[in-house]
Amino acid sequence: HADGVFTSDYSRLLGQLSARKYLESLIXXXXXXXXXXXXXXXXXHSDALFTDTYTRLRKQMAMKKYLNSVLN
């Protein structure tokens, strides 16, 4: 009887540990995916800001060049 109780309790404990590991892996995977998505969104946002700033700079340079050619 004692062996059966021990085996049953031990099996339950292993099941709980497996479930805990599985949940922790899901949580870590979800956190990593959220961090990757946030990093990708931040990278895309940074790229867009760079492109916007670069486009403005090019327009300003073109305007200066045009004004220089008209005024001189």
UniProtKB/Swiss-Prot annotation:
Q: Which InterPro entries match?
A: Glucagon_GIP_secretin_VIP (IPR000532), VIP/GHRH-like (IPR046963)
- Entry superkingdom: Eukaryota
**Subcellular location as annotated:** Secreted
What's a Pfam family this protein contains?
Hormone_2
- Please, what other remarks does the record include? X's at positions 28 to 44 were included by homology with the human precursor sequence.
Q: Which family does it belong to?
A: Belongs to the glucagon family.
Stated name of the protein = VIP peptides
Organism lineage string: Eukaryota, Metazoa, Chordata, Craniata, Vertebrata
